[in-house]
């Protein structure tokens, strides 16, 4: 049985879920947050130590301003809730991505939650904000060069935002692509594609996907 330590999820389909039900996109994102909370619960129940969530990509900056503003308003509320609940539930928050593009108040709140939860070890939630895998790799290479280290696989890995291999990449929303998420870390990850839109995912389906992964045969290229 495969051990699942690091689950990465591309949370796609929030807008399509809302449109299909005749709602504004905002409601899709709000429902997506509820699904994200269910996923965190499943990870703790299944002893998964790292959960990486693709919240906002570098490409998402091209979306309409009012949509971007709402996403960050929602993020702000989520961070407030994280301040209240994460430490109590022994959950750590770690933000990855080009955070320099965020407003100061958002960065400050992220730092506050990261600092308050850095000792928590039941689950680490790696929240990808303003994130793109190619951008992460370029920034990691620059760090290696600035430190005057040899540019090799080990040094590049250690200078990534998240130097942790992914075991299972879950892509939801009926799209079969990686969307520039954790490409380096997914070198030998198993991939599961789900047709379900993210807001519609249930704990039962999450657990079924995890069970299917644990029964796969992993060869790591051998």
From Swiss-Prot:
Key words of the record: Magnesium, Metal-binding, Transferase
Enzyme Commission number: 2.5.1.-
Cofactor note: Binds 2 magnesium ions per subunit.
Residues annotated as the enzyme's active site: 12, 60
Binding site for substrate: 13-17, 57-59, 61, 63, 171, 177-179
Binding site for Mg(2+): 12, 190
InterPro entries reported for this sequence: UPP_synth-like, UPP_synth-like_CS, UPP_synth-like_sf
UniProt keyword Membrane present: no
Gene3D superfamilies cross-referenced by the UniProt entry: Decaprenyl diphosphate synthase-like
BP GO annotations: polyprenol biosynthetic process
Cofactor: Mg(2+)
Assembly information from the UniProt record: Homodimer.
Task of the protein: Catalyzes the condensation of isopentenyl diphosphate (IPP) with allylic pyrophosphates generating different type of terpenoids.
Record-given protein name: Isoprenyl transferase
């Amino acid at each position: 049985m495969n051990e699942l330590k690091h689950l990465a999820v591309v949370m796609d389909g929030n807008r399509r879920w809302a449109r299909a039900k005749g709602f504004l996109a905002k409601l899709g994102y709000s429902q997506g947050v509820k699904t994200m909370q269910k996923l965190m619960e499943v990870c703790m129940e299944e002893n998964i130590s790292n959960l990486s969530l693709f919240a906002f990509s570098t490409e998402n900056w091209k979306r309409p301003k009012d949509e971007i503003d709402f996403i960050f308003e929602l993020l702000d509320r989520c961070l407030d809730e994280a301040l209240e609940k994460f430490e109590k539930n022994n959950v750590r928050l770690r933000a990855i991505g080009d955070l320099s593009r965020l407003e100061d108040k958002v960065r400050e709140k992220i730092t506050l939650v990261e600092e308050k939860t850095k000792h928590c070890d039941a689950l680490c939630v790696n929240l990808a904000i303003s994130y793109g895998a190619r951008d992460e790799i370029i920034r990691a290479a620059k760090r290696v060069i600035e430190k005057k280290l040899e540019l090799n696989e080990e040094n590049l890995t250690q200078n990534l935002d998240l130097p942790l291999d992914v075991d299972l990449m879950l892509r939801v929303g009926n799209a079969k692509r990686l969307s520039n998420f954790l490409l380096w870390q997914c070198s030998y990850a198993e991939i599961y594609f789900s047709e379900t839109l993210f807001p519609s995912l249930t704990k039962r389906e999450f657990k079924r996907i995890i069970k299917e992964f644990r029964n796969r045969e992993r060869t790591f290229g051998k």
